[in-house]
From Swiss-Prot:
Predominant location category: cytoplasm
Extent of Low complexity compositional bias: 16-44
Region CH1: start-end pairs: 340-483
Keyword Acetylation: yes
Residues annotated with Phosphoserine modification: 36, 139, 449
CDD domains (alphabetical): PTB_Shc, SH2_SHC
Name of the protein in question: SHC-transforming protein 1
InterPro entries reported for this sequence: CEP152/SHC-Transforming, PH-like_dom_sf, PID_Shc-like, PTB/PI_dom, SH2, SH2_dom_sf, SHC_SH2
Length: 579
């Protein structure tokens, strides 16, 4: 009787695999073949199969990065079992460093935690990503198995539009970056449940919702159901998520990509919903909820993921010198228009957006701290990806020693100065005026006793030696003949004159000569819009006007709203001044 030779044990170093006969006899399955560490492999990263039909989040389109460690920049990539493997190539190292410096690292951490354990795992150390997971020309987003749904040119250009229903938004009181991944997901899904209960006819409203836990109740605030249930056109592009009413073409919101911190789908009971957290001047930080037709929610999430990937590749091609974390920033559209906001307790940026605080050496600091030390402000350009408004050092023209100590700013004409807001160190402006022979009245803001407009253009004119606009006198004389011009008026006095939606008036700034403010009432909320840019030009985001009267008549006669910072102001009834 012949004895069968013993079956050889499977060696992972063998070139051939076990035959089907050997597999059946052994009763065990060979381990899965490990991916090649070659950096040239650009094959798509397959998502976990069990999660294909389940609701997902935007984060599930990104690689697993929970083991990312930044403590050892020189660390190499580890193999699947921890053995040192082939070091990442230079291109990967630079991409990983750019990822770390860009401020996107907190957004990409804890990705794919909702998916199962069947997908590939990649260990990342030293800020370097594995070759198959990342290359500069590759993809950092786990594409769907069928690939992206739309051509890149379309997402980078006009965008992709979906017809959905806007269900409202819920205020988020904490930064999403301060929360872990599971809590972020719970926040968005709890916001979806709150809106479903509040809006009649919403999908998933019939199910019983568990009481909101105490931690979530402290994170979520009030709901805003102003446009709840309205059919809208959602346009997804690399620049923004645009929400426009389908019938009247009114823009409900326009959230720049850098202001979006998290996006997620619903749970199995609310699978047709998409929620994302964004910041805007109207709702501050809020979770916006969209109801999609059946089967469309996954496509919307996938398109948002594609837009994020393309946006990050744009950032890699044009990285800024300095980057600020995206969740602290709200979008800035580069418009010369901006809303005049009431001065808050802690001073804010020249272009006023919630959550921004001026750095040391700004206009406000130097006014309030007479004789304070002069800090050095770095020179930087605005980020094309994160939209971060960064200070650019500007100096008084007569202070030669300060210019030698500080970095020279990039050449910036007057128009770019307004689009790229700058800080001016005005500590020695009074000395410069006295050296020039002009005494000038003392600044009322030095002791904080006199109120002032937050958008005070005077320091910019002094530091840049810009003469007053030559047409300011003629403009003032022309406005005196307009019944809706009230001269110098404070914010509260102007708001007291507004009674109905559509009421408006024009007033002169109490602290900035030559600056005029349009005050109007829209949806019960007063709006204050600046009309003159630093060059003395009356303009909106899209048009220039000969005068303030021309701007008012143009929008009244054509029944066109003025759009600023994502909100509208309609000019319907002028408020005449009292004679």
């Amino acid at each position: 009787m012949d004895l069968l030779p013993p079956k050889p044990k499977y060696n992972p170093l063998r070139n051939e695999s076990l035959s089907s006969l050997e597999e059946g006899a052994s009763g065990s399955t060979p381990p899965e073949e490990l991916p090649s560490p070659s950096a040239s492999s650009l094959g798509p990263i397959l998502p976990p199969l069990p999660g294909d039909d389940s609701p997902t989040t935007l984060c599930s389109f990104f690689p697993r990065m929970s083991n990312l460690k930044l403590a050892n920049p020189a660390g190499g990539r580890l193999g699947p079992k921890g053995e040192p493997g082939k070091a990442a190539e230079d291109g990967e190292g630079s991409a990983g460093a750019a990822l770390r410096d860009s401020g996107l690292l907190p957004l990409l951490q804890d990705m794919n935690k909702l998916s199962g354990g069947g997908g590939r795992r990649t260990r990342v150390e030293g800020g370097q990503l594995g070759g198959e997971e990342w290359t500069r020309h590759g993809s950092f987003v786990n594409k769907p198995t069928r690939g992206w749904l739309h051509p890149n040119d379309k997402v980078m250009g006009p965008g992709v539009s979906y017809l959905v229903r806007y269900m409202g938004c819920v205020e988020v009181l904490q930064s999403m970056r301060a929360l872990d991944f599971n809590t972020r997901t719970q926040v968005t899904r709890e916001a979806i449940s709150l809106v479903c209960e509040a809006v009649p006819g919403a999908k998933g409203a019939t199910r019983r919702r568990k009481p909101c836990s105490r931690p979530l109740s402290s994170i979520l605030g009030r709901s805003n159901l102003k446009f709840a249930g309205m059919p809208i056109t959602l346009t997804v592009s690399t620049s923004s998520l645009n929400l426009m009413a389908a019938d009247c073409k009114q823009i409900i919101a326009n959230h720049h990509m850098q202001s979006i911190s998290f996006a997620s789908g619903g749970d199995p009971d609310t699978a047709e919903y998409v929620a994302y957290v964004a910041k805007d001047p109207v709702n501050q930080r809020a979770c916006h909820i969209l109801e999609c037709p059946e089967g469309l929610a996954q496509d919307v999430i996938s398109t948002i993921g594609q837009a994020f990937e393309l946006r990050f590749k744009q950032y890699l091609r044009n990285p800024p010198k300095l980057v600020t974390p995206h969740d602290r920033m709200a979008g800035f559209d580069g418009s010369a228009w901006d809303e005049e906001e009431e001065e808050p307790p802690d001073h804010q940026y020249y272009n006023d957006f919630p959550g921004k605080e001026p750095p040391l050496g700004g206009v406000v600091d130097m006014r309030l701290r007479e004789g304070a030390a002069r800090p050095t402000l770095p020179s930087a350009q605005m980020s094309s990806h994160l939209g971060a408004t960064l200070p650019i050092g500007q100096h008084a023209a007569g202070d030669h020693e300060v210019r030698k100590q500080m970095l020279p700013p990039p050449p910036c004409p007057g128009r770019e100065l307004f689009d790229d807001p700058s800080y001016v160190n005005i500590q020695n402006l009074d000395k410069a005026r006295q050296a020039g022979g002009g005494a000038g009245p003392p600044n009322p803001s030095l002791n904080g006793s006199a109120p002032r407009d937050l958008f005070d253009m005077k320091p910019f004119e002094d530091a840049l030696r810009v003469p007053p606009p030559p047409q300011s006198m003629s403009m003032a004389e022309q406005l005196q003949g307009e019944p809706w011009f009230h001269g110098k008026l404070s914010r509260r006095e102007a708001e007291a004159l507004l009674q109905l939606n559509g009421d408006f008036l024009v007033r002169e700034s109490t602290t900035t000569p030559g600056q005029y403010v349009l005050t109007g009432l829209q949806s019960g909320q007063p709006k204050h819009l600046l009309l003159v840019d630093p060059e003395g030009v009356v303009r909106t985001k899209d048009h220039r006007f000969e005068s303030v009267s021309h701007l008012i008549s143009y929008h009244m006669d054509n029944h066109l709203p003025i759009i600023s910072a994502g909100s509208e102001l309609c000019l319907q009834q002028p408020v005449d001044r009292k004679v």
